[in-house]
Amino acid sequence: MTFRRTWQNKSTHLKITLGAFVLSALSTTSLADPIDKSAIQFIGPLAEDMQLKPYQTDHRDAIIANLLPSLQTSSDSIHLFGNDVDWQAFDKVSALTLGGLQALKFTASTDRFSQGTLTLKGIENAQLFIDGEKQTEKNQAYELALSQGDHQIVIITEQVANWNQVELDFTAKSELDTLQFSAKQQHGLSAKQLFDAPTINFVSMAPNGDYFITSKRHYEDATANQAQYVTELKDAKNNTLYRFESAQPSSITWSPDSKRLVYLLNGELKRLNLKTMQLSVIAKNLSGANGFQFYDSNSLIFSWSKSPEDNGKLTKHYQGLQDRWSYARTTSQVYLLDIATGLSKIVSQGPLSHSLEDFDAKRGSILMSRSAQAMQLSPEPATELVELNLATSALNVLGQFKTFNQAKYTNEGIYVTAGPDFNNGLGRNLPQSMLANNYDGQLYLLSRDGKKATALSKEFNPAIGQLNVLENGDALIKVTEQDTVQLYQYDLSKKRFNKVNAGFDVVEQFSYSKERNPSILLTGTTASTPQQLKQLSLGKSRAKILWDSKPIAYKDTAIASLEEFNFTNKDGVEIKGRVYLPHNVDKSKKYPALVYYYGGTSPVTRGFTGRYPFNLWAEHGYVVYVVQPTGATGFGQEFSAKHVNAWGEYTANDIIDGTKAFLNQYHFVDSKRVGNLGASYGGFMTMLLATKTDMFSASIAHAGISNITSYWGQGWWGYLYSNEASKNSYPWNNPTLYSQHSPVFHADKVTTPLLLLHGDSDTNVPVGESHNMYTALKLLGKDVELIEYKGADHQIFARDKRFDWWDTMLAYFDKNLKEQPQWWQYLYAEK
């Protein structure tokens, strides 16, 4: 309950006795009185017999930092030096002074970016933390700058003479800065949770299913951009047998009998005996080696790359389009390594790089691929699939293909994944007049000699990605199915696909045993549920949860609600979409909205988090509409083929019409406060939409393409992507496509405020693409901003940059869609 009374003093300086309170500076004539102190949590004394306080030692910061995590949890007590110490309401504290340490904890909430100064009185020595981050103190005062949401404040006190005289002074920077303080446990989703939460980034299961390995990654304030890893070996009952903490092993592989584990760590190849837990070194000096697998019980097969040394010349002579890549002259070959002696021998031949696809130790054959493009210095990509006979060293070329992704042996031949145009269009399921989109992965069966190929997935709409082969010869494949990522088993004997029901919207990592009835270990999320690790037996419907990040990182966290929203476009095609609603949405009010899309050749999948945090945007008060426009894979070949030579032709209409349908359905969204954003091809779409419609009130393009020709010619992979997106079209034979579909050629039509974001080291879509549009719009006197991230490539990965990037996008939309420019001004104050 909030009480208000008239306040005569015109100052916005507010004095609050410590307790649960509401502070408001909405006007200089009203103030919310302090509410009951019982809403503030207090704990103490902590280590009452402490002879010296932390500030009296040489290790104050370390002592306090180590205590903090225990105070941040929602537990009712902490266990300290053998005793339980309970949290209690602050109004129950009657002692004037206490030994040891004490702590106060409460939540600061705001429905907009707010600033002010918090001053501690009556506390002589303390450290204050907001969301786990230590704040800088100046004359017992702390400057607050809080984004919309809930923020945990913890004050660890070391010296208080009289608790009855403790006060907090809060000075709001302006009448618009509003904060509410309480002791509530539930809180809204935060950026730190999404980025820092522990996630499993690697899983591997032993062939017999008795052991498995997981590697978890998390971030924290103390280590900033440096991820923290813990890799664990576990038994079938989920008991930890061995733990790697100091460094993360790679190239983990199991012996065929599941008795030994081999991995690469710090350039050394090591072997762990799972019975004795004895560790031995097999080989050293393996820089550039990766992908180790047991070829048989005595040897390992792997790839070993070598980069050329700098020739010291002042010039660089390009011998082909690939020379724009920093790794163009790096070669990789396939090797065998003898475990007993550590001796390695090369098995692939010639100057070209060879990629290991698969091997069959019983037949003594190795399946590899190599780039025919590199062989011929041709701009047209092509891949040769070759088979090496180890006994005779004979190399058999099985075929040369313009589209190729992966190959694996099976009982009846070789599985191949590639686009619809594989083997002269064998996988096409399209009208003759349409060009296929070869990013739409298909499954094929190739005979052992490469002379006969069969298309297996022409009637299967999901796009096929990662390929694995089970012991019985069936394929286990990860696919993009509409806006989800799923696992399927391809039953080779029955020629059909069977879905593996794991209960995830997005399957991430997976591994499987080599038993007759294989066990599968997999991680994944749903749009509204954070990562879990599950185990299931193939063919059985029930999955067992082995690990769940929700109680670890998202306890007491309110998550946005999700609704499906689809519409039928002008061509009669259903366009999928989904809508995220703020968890406390009040449909009697009007809300701003954000429309997100990619628009390129893949859909925006339903992962819980990612580079574009839809759940976080909803927590900041936006209704978020994610639309899957025409051209994406996962919806069938005809749908994805419309990406070819379109460059926004269908996509723009779907986004515009989808937004109109969304606004018609969601009456509580304010149509005058709708923003839109996308990245890469989605950034191109943002710029293009700005030239076609004024329905959006603010737009953001990250790493967008403004001039198709310059992207094609200068982006590292621009010409390769254009082999599909602009198939058979070039600036000289189709200048209309390259110019009239390029947003910069229509910059004079832009009326919407536009924020351009870009990494200044982007090699995929060079930063000049944003500069083109920025220059044009500035000369035209348009409302445009350009923000570059120093040292960042196409995506923003580093923790500090990611938080800043997320803040920048939200601050820009707050300025333009909520009429709240303060956050943007705080981030980008004019000097």
Task: Name each model-derived stretch.
Residues 193, 200-204, 211-216, 303-304, ...:
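Non-catalytic accessory segments flanking enzyme active sites
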Residues 32-94, 154-191, 196, 821:
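Accessory carbohydrate-binding/adhesion or oligomerization-edge regions at the termini
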Residues 197, 216-230, 244-249, 263-270, ...:
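A flexible loop/linker signature enriched in serine peptidases of the S9 family
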Residues 234-237, 273-277, 338-342, 389-393, ...:
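Short loop/turn segments that connect beta-strands within beta-propeller blades
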